[in-house]
Amino acid sequence: MVYPGPPGLIAGLLLAALSLSCVDGAKALGFVGHGYNLTVSQGHEAKLNCSLQGIEEPEIQWLKDGVPVQSADQMYIPVDEDHWISFLSLKNVERPDAGKYWCEAEHSGRKSVSDAIWIMVEGVPYFTLEPKDLSVTPNSPFNMTCAAVGPPEPLVIIWWVGDSPLGKSESSPSVLQMSGIHERTAFSCEAHNAKGVSSSRTAIVEVKGLPYPPFNVTISKVTGSTATVTWFPGFNSFSLIKSCTIQVQSLHGNREMYSRLISAPPFAVLLDELQPLTNHSVRVQCTNEMGASPFTEWRTFHTKETVPQLLPQNVHMTKTETSLLLDWEEVEPDREGYNILGFKVQWEQENATQGELFVQENQANLTKWNPEKDLTIRICIANAAGCGPWSEFLLAGSKEEAGKQRHPHTRMSWVPMVLGILTALVTVVAMTLIFLRKGRKETRFGNMLGSMLGRGGPVIQFTAARSFNRRGPEMMEATLDSIGISEELKSKLKDVLIQQQQFTLGRTLGKGEFGSVREAQLKMEDDTMQKVAVKMLKAEIFCSSDIEEFLREAAFMKEFDHPNVCKLIGVSLRSRTKGRLPVPMVILPFMKHGDLHTFLLMSRIGEEPITLPVQTLVRFMIDICSGMEYLSSKNFIHRDLATRNCMLNEDMTVCVADFGLSKKIYSGDYYRQGCASKLPVKWLALESLADNVYTVHSDVWAFGVTLWEIATLGQTPYAGVENSEIYSYLIAGNRLKQPLDCLDELYEMMCQCWITEPKRRPSFVDLKQRLEAIWGRLSILSASQDQLYVNLGETCGAAAAVSGLHSAFCSEEDYCAGPSQTCGTSAITSDYRYIVNPGCLREGNEWSSSAQNGEARGLLHEEEEEEEEEMQEEQVVITL
């Protein structure tokens, strides 16, 4: 049987096979071996195995906490005909992976279950309870709570008040009891265990006070007697506003005032029972649990004029032979603010003729009327707004018989007749259109079918929309013209286009939300092969605009030529089936040591942590600063500078990379973001957060955050602060704390990068000079001290401290240098970036991790990993 596998594993299987061959007879179905506990560091790999005997070609299922494990990293191999071993590999273990694992197999209705394997995941502390924002009354006691868990245990909690630690450490959970504060104070906590430290979010405790006065008092919808008042509440001083008081004052007559108390919100009120045509003033105050705010300034408004709400009183009528005299009680012209102009008199007689008369006095004389007919009269008081309510009708009888009945005029209604005619017309037109359309269809298809039947052909013919065959779909030719990008971008990329046949894709190096990076072998002009990295978009998520944005990054990189800036090798297009856009690929140099953030993080919390000298960290900073100095000189702004976007070359040189958000400045010195993009909020400058403005000065801010990342060996900036809270946190004057053991001069440089005014920040030229001065002083200081000698003459285990350092800083040529593989003595001098080869490396099988104990390999043994991976790719024939 042929299967791939490392020599160590193959040898173990051979021994197991030999031992099993000594057992006579058939074996009963069942798992062999015992369960065990496995402790794995967060972010590393765990390998599990179980052994089953008594069945040929079994189906072995892995379960975690009773749920089947859905993972592609499972395999099982035979030891002999009825003995199998199943392997489960968990890459990049996280806390949810902790739990109970076991194997199950079923045959002929009988189920067999293996012993359990318990996985415990260790990492930096994880907060289960973080400090919360509070609002407290002045000088009143309150508590803050913080809790975190491991493993590993134990862990301790240290409280910070502002930028100062309280000094004492407590076990988790920890309750901080405060007797009271009188001003705004920030609280946070740190959790420490053997794997490192985690920082909680920063909780802000505010002190309650009186609310500020309301503002933007607005009067709207004003009528003669009502008005709507709205306002915005002032700052509530961290105590909810419960009610508001509105005072209204009439500026007419005695200037009376009244107040109304309303619950809030809403912050609006309808004022009623106002006097018409009158000036009024209004002001507002609001109240919280601490008391009332000051009143606003008086706001004046004028009510409109309304029709008089008065009736004429004591109307008298005097009838003569030729006229009818009316009189009523006088009314003051400005009574109740109505500004009365006069009176309106209306009358009507039996024959429906009407008359109207306007008089200014409190009397009227009607002469144009027929005394032989009945007369009805009514009166109202009028002003400029209109007529008020009418008085009751007065009846002046005629001389004819009083009880004569009047018949109303009958009018013929034409509405039903018109509606009937229109309905009939619409029905006729609709039916006509339906018959005409049906006739056209019958004629068209009738001719077609008739001609075919006349020739003896088929009644129905059709053309296939799609054909199917076994040769697979045709491929669309992948060219720059086929992806729909601009002519300007085509011209920039034409000379760096590489045909897909010139390189071979290999393993995946990393994946992101929108794409992936894969290792590849590129065939050069001299027929040699060069290892490269290929960055490509995910095939299922892009359109033409996505391709253009992706390739624009390549166009930027084409213009770069600097040792600390990632250089473009070329671009390529991967053909796909016809009708689908090609997959764009950007070909970049292969960076052996990956990104700087992962390197720093693994040096701190890896399986075998190493201590990076300060000189090395400062050298990283200088490399990044040199790259950014070059970009700024080319009028480029990066907009996404961070350690995750800085790559480590084979000789540990740092290169600035990932220009997906970069922009070239063609005029002026700033670029304004015009659309919504996913932006690195915690690395953005204040002006970028506020106004979407990006300049070289905003890149300097991000460089300061990058320096902080390097000094903390990859910690997350503003840990515990949500992205939505970053702007408020920074505008309040807060900045990142000084890292432990960080040089004061370095932290001062970071703080200068975070100055609020952009033009007061230092340039990359100044920053590079200052960093080189620091590095020079550190090198002189180290050179003045004795050289550090490490005795490598005993076991290689004594050299563990330097072997990791060597693996991290030596190139492949240095790694293999030296005539002997025996242990010797190594001198480490002032330049910690290049270390003399210690000449003592264990064999790959000594460094490889055991599948049973689940130890993940560390970052510092990358060479051994690559050798083992190459061996695993070979096929080995085992004869049992």
UniProtKB/Swiss-Prot annotation:
Catalytic site positions: 640 (proton acceptor)
Membrane topology field: Single-pass type I membrane protein
Domain of life of the source: Eukaryota
Catalytic activity: L-tyrosyl-[protein] + ATP = O-phospho-L-tyrosyl-[protein] + ADP + H(+)
Tissue specificity as recorded in UniProt: Detected in brain, spinal cord, intestine, lung, stomach, ovary, testis, skin and eye.
Signal sequence residues: 1-28
Protein keywords: ATP-binding, Cell adhesion, Cell membrane, Disulfide bond, Glycoprotein, Immunoglobulin domain, Kinase, Membrane, Nucleotide-binding, Phosphoprotein, Receptor, Repeat, Signal, Transferase, Transmembrane, Transmembrane helix, Tyrosine-protein kinase
Residue ranges of every copy of the Protein kinase domain listed in the record: 503-774
Coiled coil: none
Cited SUPFAM superfamilies: Fibronectin type III, Immunoglobulin, Protein kinase-like (PK-like)
Membrane spanning residue stretches: 415-435
Main location: membrane
Extracellular topological domain residue ranges: 29-414
Domain Fibronectin type-III, chain residue ranges per copy: 213-306, 311-401
Entry comment on modification after translation: Tyrosine phosphorylated upon receptor stimulation.
Example GO BP: cell adhesion
Role this protein plays: May be involved in cell adhesion processes, particularly in the central nervous system.
Family note: Belongs to the protein kinase superfamily. Tyr protein kinase family. AXL/UFO subfamily.
Protein name: Tyrosine-protein kinase receptor TYRO3
